[in-house]
Regions:
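Alpha-helical transmembrane segments of multi-pass membrane proteins
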Residues: 41-56
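Interfacial aromatic "cap" segments that immediately flank transmembrane helices
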Residues: 15-42, 116-143, 157-205
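Hydrophobic alpha-helical transmembrane bundles that constitute the permease/transmembrane domains
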Residues: 44, 48, 134-135, 207, ...
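Hydrophobic alpha-helical transmembrane segments of multi-pass membrane proteins
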Residues: 78-86, 143-150, 163, 237-245
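A conserved helix-loop-strand patch within extracytoplasmic ligand-binding domains
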Residues: 69-82, 96-99, 104, 109, ...
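Juxtamembrane transition segments at transmembrane-helix termini in multipass membrane proteins
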Residues: 1-8, 20, 57-69, 91, ...
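Hydrophobic alpha-helical transmembrane segments of multi-pass integral membrane proteins
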Residues: 37-45, 87, 91
Length: 290
C-alpha cells in the first residue's frame, strides 16, 4: 500500500508539478475533506454568518445609509474582510500541516493516516509564528507595492515558500524568508509562471461554484423580482465554501513545487536511497559471513 502513495519529495518538471497536485488531491480527498470539515469549516460558517448582515442591509435598502458618513456598514465590511484573511491563513496553516505530517509519515514508512489531533497539534505548535510571518509577509508586499507595483510582485514570489519552510522544516521567522528567497534564486520567472497558472486554473474551477449566483441574478433580470435573503445567503455560502476548497488545490500546488525545488537543492531522497543501498550491502555481507 505504501508504494502506491505519492512521494512529494521528488524532482519534477513544471507540468509534472501541476499533474501531481491534482493526483495528490484525488489520493487524499476523503482525508482532506474530513479534516477540512472539522478544522476549517466552522470558521467559514462564522464568516458566512457575518456576511449575512451585509446581505440583509443590501436587500433591506439600508446599504446607502449604512455606508454614509462612516456608518456601521464600513465596520461590518472591515470585520468581514479581516475575518476572510484570517480564515485563508488558517486554511493555509491546515494544508501545510497536513503536508508536513504526510511527508513525515511517508519518509518513516508509516501508514499514512492523519488524525485530527495530529493536525491540531502541528497547527497549534506553529500557529503563533505562522501568523506573525503572515503579517510580515503582507507588510513586505504592501510596502513593495507602495514604492512601485513591480517590487511588490517580486517580493510576493520570492517569499512564497516562507510558510512552507516555517511549517514543514521548522525554520524560524527570518530564516524562513531567507530560505525561500534562496530556493527561488534563478527561478523567479519560472515560479511566477507556476503561481500564475495555478491561480488561473483554480479561478476557472471556482467559477463552477459561482454558477448559482448567475442563475439567481439572471432570474431577477428576467422576472424583475428582487432575490430573497434566503436565496442570496444560500448561493453566497456555496460560492464561499467552494472558493476555500479551490484554495486547497492552490496551496497543495505551492507545496508540491516547494518539495520539488527542495529536492533539486538538497537531493534528500537520493541520499536516503544511497543510504538504504549501503545498509542492504552491509546486511548481505553479514549474511554471507555467517
Amino acid at each position: 500500500m505504501q508504494t502506491k502513495k505519492i512521494n512529494l519529495l521528488e524532482k519534477r518538471t513544471f507540468s509534472d508539478e501541476l499533474t501531481v497536485t491534482f493526483q495528490f488531491i484525488k489520493q487524499e480527498f476523503k482525508s482532506l475533506i474530513k479534516a477540512f470539515s472539522a478544522i476549517v469549516l466552522p470558521l467559514i460558517f462564522v464568516e458566512l454568518f457575518l456576511q449575512s448582515f451585509l446581505l440583509r442591509d443590501i436587500l433591506g435598502g439600508a446599504a446607502r445609509n449604512a455606508f454614509a458618513d462612516g456608518g456601521s456598514g464600513w465596520t461590518t465590511m472591515l470585520v468581514n474582510y479581516l475575518l476572510a484573511i484570517f480564515v485563508f491563513a488558517w486554511l493555509q496553516l491546515f494544508v501545510l500541516s497536513y503536508l508536513r505530517l504526510y511527508t513525515d509519515k511517508y519518509l518513516q514508512q508509516e501508514e499514512i493516516k492523519i488524525s485530527f489531533l495530529e493536525l491540531l497539534k502541528v497547527m497549534g505548535r506553529n500557529s503563533g509564528l505562522f501568523f506573525v510571518l503572515g503579517i510580515v509577509y503582507l507588510f513586505y508586499v504592501v510596502m513593495g507595492c507602495v514604492i512601485f507595483i513591480l517590487p511588490g510582485i517580486y517580493i510576493s514570489v520570492i517569499f512564497i515558500f516562507s510558510s512552507c519552510f516555517l511549517i514543514i522544516r521548522d525554520r524560524k521567522l527570518f530564516s524562513a524568508f531567507a530560505s525561500s528567497a534562496d530556493l527561488c534564486r534563478g527561478q523567479w520567472w519560472n515560479t511566477f509562471g507556476y503561481i500564475l497558472l495555478c491561480s488561473l486554473i483554480v479561478s476557472m474551477l471556482g467559477y463552477v461554484f459561482n454558477l448559482p449566483y448567475l442563475g439567481i441574478f439572471l432570474e431577477a433580470y428576467l422576472t424583475g423580482n428582487q432575490p430573497g435573503l434566503f436565496e442570496l445567503t444560500l448561493v453566497n455560502s456555496v460560492g464561499t465554501i467552494g472558493r476555500y476548497l479551490m484554495n486547497i488545490v492552490f496551496i497543495v500546488g505551492i507545496g508540491v513545487r516547494f518539495f520539488s525545488r527542495l529536492e533539486r537543492k538538497e537531493h534528500r531522497t537520493l541520499l536516503d536511497k544511497i543510504g538504504q543501498i549501503g545498509t542492504e550491502e552491509r546486511t548481505e555481507s553479514g549474511e554471507d559471513g555467517v
